[in-house]
Every structure is written in structure tokens, then in C-alpha cells.
From Swiss-Prot:
Monooxygenase involved in the biosynthesis of limonoids triterpene natural products such as limonin, a compound with insecticidal activity responsible for the bitter taste in citrus. Catalyzes the formation of (1R,2R,3S,8R,10R,11R,15S,16S)-3-(acetyloxy)-15-(1-hydroxy-4-oxobutan-2-yl)-2,7,7,11,16-pentamethyl-5-oxo-6-oxatetracyclo[9.7.0.0(2,8).0(12,16)]octadec-12-en-10-yl acetate. It is a single-pass membrane protein. Expressed in maturing fruits and in juice vesicles. GO terms for biological process: saponin biosynthetic process. Its EC number is 1.14.14.-. The lineage of its organism: Eukaryota, Viridiplantae, Streptophyta, Embryophyta, Tracheophyta. This is Cytochrome P450 family 716 subfamily AD polypeptide 2. PROSITE patterns: CYTOCHROME_P450. It catalyses: (1R,2R,3S,8R,10R,11R,15S,16S)-3-(acetyloxy)-15-[(4R)-4-[(2S)-3,3-dimethyloxiran-2-yl]-1,4-dihydroxybutan-2-yl]-2,7,7,11,16-pentamethyl-5-oxo-6-oxatetracyclo[9.7.0.0(2,8).0(12,16)]octadec-12-en-10-yl acetate + reduced [NADPH--hemoprotein reductase] + O2 = (1R,2R,3S,8R,10R,11R,15S,16S)-3-(acetyloxy)-15-(1-hydroxy-4-oxobutan-2-yl)-2,7,7,11,16-pentamethyl-5-oxo-6-oxatetracyclo[9.7.0.0(2,8).0(12,16)]octadec-12-en-10-yl acetate + 2-methylpropanoate + oxidized [NADPH--hemoprotein reductase] + H2O + 2 H(+). Belongs to the cytochrome P450 family. Heme binds at C433. InterPro entries: Cyt_P450, Cyt_P450_CS, Cyt_P450_E_grp-I, Cyt_P450_sf. It is found in: Membrane. It comes from Citrus sinensis (Sweet orange).
């Protein structure tokens, strides 16, 4: 009995000591945080209204880097606070800031997206989190990360690209590059993710997906006629289309129609779960296919448009790309598809792609949410505040890139090392774009065929890409085509 009382007393004392120690640490932490100032900037009325207007104004001229540079110059700091997409937000403005943020995923910060992004993918009466979306995407794309997975998809992608040119470019005197690029990248994404080849389904789904993507940064107002309302309806229709495809694919699996010989993500996922006796809800699969497709097709189409624009404006660079691609084509037999080895030879073309991404990255960056108060560069980042890393902070910054406004693909072949975390078109850390190699693949294959088939000029010489908030061509970038004799 005495021993039991002694043990209970000891346990009580230890519990009290732990409790007081916790209170001491928490109090010191809070006091330390309170001593730190917030980053400089404006988040209160009426200043945040003018901050938002200034950001939007510069986005419309694709000069967000000036919005950031002006505040860096004004505050003399590597971060500042502002109001962005309705949130108190801290912008990190250096390569060191990018590294800090990418290195602290799930430690100090977690991924965050505007509420409209999540609402688009919700079912009625259902709520989802950013983490659920990211986890599902990684599960789906795990098949893309298998050894030699990229090489297996080169021939398929090459065939889709060739079919696209035959249908929409060959025989045309003028084309709108941006809408056709979106059609191409959507076709490629649907083929690789779900082996969708039915033209009727593809043509119905593409404008629906456009509605979905446009709503990611829209005002969170869900009334008939609003951008968000159209996106939610479009997302539901897309889910219905994909549920029907999934049911058909399950039927093929049960009838042993060689589904395990397909390389698309959906078929591989169904076969794997069937073999292991697991079942996945069709609506869950369809919802995540919509989410994946929204990420997979939009950004590559913008980069294709950017490259076509830049090559039209710089004939000497166009000629170097064409010369490289003609040399690669000479090694191929008639009708032979491109291979991974061919793609690896596209070194100058890859430099052009990289430089286009530096100057005209499709997305400005992504967001994190502070999991707790933390100190960055002597400033307090409060729990719940949003933190933004942006390509515009470093991609056009002379501290990291000489002559940053000049389109110079050779900067990626020189021996000058690029400062780590200064070139981040695909993000970094746990949330680096999982499909980046596939995006590069389809863009390079597009370049291979377009420069061998055509020379072109812009119909509107002054047309440039703008942001609202992501990059796009406001007039579609129409170009006049001057075809070459072409042998496949």
C-alpha cells in the first residue's frame, strides 16, 4: 500500500512538473514571438485595396516582378506583407526564402490553396482538404515515377502530337496557337492518364475543364452565372463522364480484355487494386482524375504558346532549334516514332524551353499556411498567415540572372552555375510538380514537329502574354503559317 502511494505521489509530481515546464516553454515562446515585428507592408484598409489593385495592374502586363522589386527596394528586406487573394500574406523574395519554405513543408508550413480551388472538386455536402488532393495526386502519379516510365510514353505522346498537327495545322494558313496548344496538351493528358481517345468525349470535356481552371482564383461566390458556379457544374459533369469511363474499364477488367497491358494511369490503378483485392470508389477516382487533368494540361499549353511567340520574335533562335531538330530527324526511319534517346539530344531546344519558363512561367507560384508562429529573417510569421513563394522574385532578378529581361537560352548551357532555388518553374520540396518531366516531354516533341513543318509570324506583332492570375494569350496568339516540305 505504501509503495502504491509512493508511486502515485511520484507520478503526480512528474505530471505537475511536465505541465509547468510546458507552460514555461509556451510562455517564453509567446513572449519571444511578441517581441518580433511583423514583416513590413500593408494589410489594413484602405492600403490593402491599393496593394491588390497594383498587383492586378502589373499582372495584366506580366510585370509582377516589378511589384515585388519595388517593395524589396522600399523595405530593404527579404520579405514583406500584403493583401493577396483576400488573405494576409507574406511574400518571400529570395532564393534563400524559396529554400526555407520548401525545406519546411509539414514542419512550419503546409500547402494552402484558395477556397474556390477546393469547392470546385467537392461533391454535394462534402468537404475536402488540400492534403487530400495532394495525397490523391501522388497516388495516381506513382506509376509515372516507375523506372523507365517516361520512356514508355514517348512513342504514345509523339503519335498524339503528330495526329494533332494533321488535324489542326496541316493545310492551314493561320492558326490560333493558344487554343490549339490547350487542345493538344489536354489530348496528351487524357491519353496518358486514362487512355481516352474518343474525339467526342475530348471535345466535350475540354471547355468544361477550362471552366474548372478559371475558377481556382475566382471570387468565392456560388450563384448562377458566376465563374465558381460554372466551374462546379463543369466539374460535376466531368466526374460523370469519367465515372462512365471507369465503369466501362472495370467491365473490361472483369472480362479479361488485356487491361494489364495498357500503360495509362487509370488502367494500371484498377488492375493493381483488383489484384490486391482492394476496391476504390468510382466517384473518388473520377474526382481525382478531374483534379489531375486540371494540373496536367493547362501549364504546358501556356509554355508551348510562349515558345511559339518567342521563336517568332527571334528568327536566329528559331533557326538553331530547327537545325537541331532536323539533325535528329535524319537518324529516324520513315514513320519511326521518337525515342527517349532522341529527346535527350534536344539540348538547345531544352534551353529554349527553360528560358521560356524563366521569363514566362505559367504559374506565379504556390502558397503555404503557417502551422505555428515562426521567425523568418527576424520577422514574426503568425500562425494561420499565408506565405507565398513566387517565380517573379528570382526569375527576373539581376542578382540571380544577368540581363534578366533578355531572352537568352545560352545562359542554360554556360558554365555559370545557377544559384540553387533561384530557378523554380516547377516549385520545390515535397510539392514539386510531379508531372514536370512529362510536361517537358510533350513540349519538346511539339517543338520537334512544328519547326520542321512550319515557319510562322505573329498576326498581331505586339501581342504579349498576360496574367489573370496565370499566364495566357488574350487574343489566342494567331500566327500565319509558311509550310516546309515535310517527311515524317
Amino acid at each position: 500500500m505504501e509503495l502504491l502511494l509512493l508511486l502515485l505521489s511520484t507520478l503526480l509530481i512528474l505530471t505537475l512538473c511536465c505541465h509547468f515546464f510546458y507552460l514555461f516553454i509556451r510562455t517564453n515562446k509567446q513572449n519571444g514571438s511578441e517581441k518580433l515585428p511583423l514583416p513590413p507592408g500593408h494589410v489594413s484598409w484602405p492600403f490593402k485595396y491599393f496593394e491588390t489593385l497594383d498587383y492586378l495592374k502589373k499582372a495584366r502586363t506580366n510585370t509582377i516582378h516589378k511589384f515585388i522589386a519595388e517593395r524589396v527596394q522600399k523595405y530593404k528586406t527579404k520579405c514583406f506583407k500584403t493583401c493577396h487573394i483576400g488573405q494576409n500574406m507574406v511574400f518571400l523574395t529570395s532564393a534563400e526564402g524559396n529554400k526555407f519554405l520548401f525545406s519546411n513543408d509539414y514542419k512550419l508550413v503546409r500547402s494552402w490553396w484558395p477556397v474556390t480551388f477546393l469547392k470546385v472538386f467537392e461533391n454535394a455536402g462534402e468537404e475536402i482538404t488540400v492534403e487530400e488532393v495532394i495525397r490523391a495526386r501522388k497516388q495516381f502519379l506513382s506509376f509515372f515515377n516507375e523506372p523507365d516510365a517516361l520512356a514508355r510514353h514517348v512513342a504514345i505522346t509523339d503519335q498524339v502530337v503528330q495526329d494533332h498537327f494533321k488535324c489542326y495545322w496541316d493545310g492551314s494558313k493561320q492558326v490560333g496557337v493558344y487554343p490549339l496548344a490547350r487542345k493538344l496538351t489536354f489530348d496528351v493528358s487524357c491519353r496518358l492518364l486514362a487512355d481516352i481517345q474518343d474525339r467526342e468525349i475530348l471535345d466535350e470535356s475540354l471547355p468544361l475543364m477550362g471552366n474548372v481552371v478559371r475558377a481556382f482564383f475566382a471570387f468565392p461566390i456560388n450563384f448562377p452565372g458566376t465563374i465558381l458556379n460554372r466551374a462546379i457544374k463543369s466539374s460535376r459533369r466531368l466526374r460523370k463522364i469519367f465515372v462512365d469511363i471507369i465503369k466501362e474499364r472495370r467491365g473490361d477488367l472483369l472480362e479479361k480484355k488485356n487491361l494489364d497491358q495498357r500503360n495509362d494511369v487509370l488502367s494500371r490503378l484498377l488492375v493493381e487494386n483488383y489484384k490486391e483485392g482492394r476496391d476504390i470508389d468510382d466517384v473518388f477516382l473520377a474526382k481525382n482524375l478531374v483534379s489531375l487533368l486540371s494540373a496536367a494540361y493547362d501549364n504546358p499549353s501556356v509554355t508551348i504558346t510562349s515558345i511559339v511567340k518567342n521563336l517568332a520574335e527571334r528568327p536566329e533562335i528559331y533557326e538553331k532549334v530547327r537545325k537541331e531538330q532536323i539533325e535528329i530527324a535524319k537518324s529516324k526511319a520513315p514513320g519511326e516514332h521518337m525515342s527517349m534517346e532522341d529527346v535527350k539530344k534536344m539540348k538547345f531546344s531544352m534551353n529554349v524551353l527553360s528560358e521560356s519558363l524563366r521569363l514566362e512561367a505559367p504559374a506565379s507560384g504556390t502558397f503555404r499556411e503557417a502551422l505555428d508562429d515562426f521567425n523568418y529573417e527576424g520577422f514574426l510569421i503568425p500562425k494561420g498567415w499565408k506565405v507565398h513563394w513566387s517565380v517573379h522574385a528570382t526569375h527576373r532578378n539581376p542578382e540571380y540572372f544577368s540581363n534578366p529581361e533578355t531572352f537568352d537560352p545560352s545562359r542554360f548551357e554556360r558554365n555559370d552555375p545557377i544559384v540553387p532555388y533561384s530557378y523554380v518553374p516547377f516549385g520545390g520540396g515535397h510539392h514539386i510538380c510531379p508531372g514536370k518531366d512529362y510536361a517537358k516531354l510533350q513540349i519538346l516533341l511539339f517543338m520537334h514537329h512544328v519547326v520542321r513543318k512550319f515557319k510562322w509570324e505573329k498576326v498581331n506583332p505586339d501581342e504579349q502574354l498576360i496574367r489573370a492570375p496565370n499566364l495566357f494569350a488574350p487574343k489566342g496568339l494567331p500566327v500565319r503559317l509558311y509550310p516546309y516540305a515535310y517527311e515524317n
